């Protein structure tokens, strides 16, 4: 277990992940962190409350932060429902997750040396870190690594995806040759373009 091994060498590891619908809150002893929750993220002109829950992996002495929102993650899986139908708002979910993680790290006043992004749901984080959050003390000196997995979605993202992901500090030029509709390969390429290192499975 890589995070545990790094933690045992005296480094601090914090894990952030979406609070998928199949995660049992009672069994895993998740609890909401009120001081971190309560912020609204505006995506596509709509307010979405950011709820932060935390659990501990006792054996590794490591905390896991769960990014939650009733609309995007409650009772929902990673990419598709139980019938294999992909969620139409996967693009908004990815925007919410990436921004939710970065806002939580800011609130924690934590300055990670390395931010390791795993899979397509994290693909917007490298762009946000290098452009929209580049002057934030938490991210100013951080290196970003993106791991590509075979966790692809089959459909394209919504036609207004580029507009949804825009934040202050990001220009259309920063999106390079991102053409809509955006598919899995184009989304991963955007992540790779803004990462300091890439790991391919």
What are the residue ranges of the model-derived segments?
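Catalytic cores of nucleotide-sugar-dependent glycosyltransferases that transfer UDP/GDP/TDP-activated
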Residues: 1-201
């Amino acid at each position: 277990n890589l995070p545990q091994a790094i933690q045992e060498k005296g480094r601090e590891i914090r894990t952030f992940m979406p609070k998928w619908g199949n995660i049992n809150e009672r069994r895993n002893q998740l609890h909401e962190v009120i001081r971190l929750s309560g912020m609204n993220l505006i995506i596509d002109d709509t307010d979405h409350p950011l709820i932060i829950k935390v659990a501990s992996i006792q054996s590794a002495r490591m905390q896991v932060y769960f990014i939650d929102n009733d609309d995007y993650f409650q009772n929902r899986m990673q990419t598709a429902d139980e019938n294999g139908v992909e969620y139409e708002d996967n693009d908004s979910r990815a925007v919410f997750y990436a921004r939710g993680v970065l806002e939580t790290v800011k609130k924690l006043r934590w300055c990670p040396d390395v931010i390791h992004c795993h899979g397509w749901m994290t693909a917007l984080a490298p762009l946000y870190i290098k452009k929209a959050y580049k002057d934030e003390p938490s991210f100013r000196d951080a290196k970003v690594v993106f791991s590509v997995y075979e966790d692809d979605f089959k459909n394209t993202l919504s036609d207004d995806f580029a507009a949804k992901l825009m934040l202050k500090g990001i220009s259309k030029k920063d999106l390079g040759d991102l053409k809509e509709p955006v598919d899995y390969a184009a989304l991963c390429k955007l992540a790779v373009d803004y990462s300091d290192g890439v790991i391919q499975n």
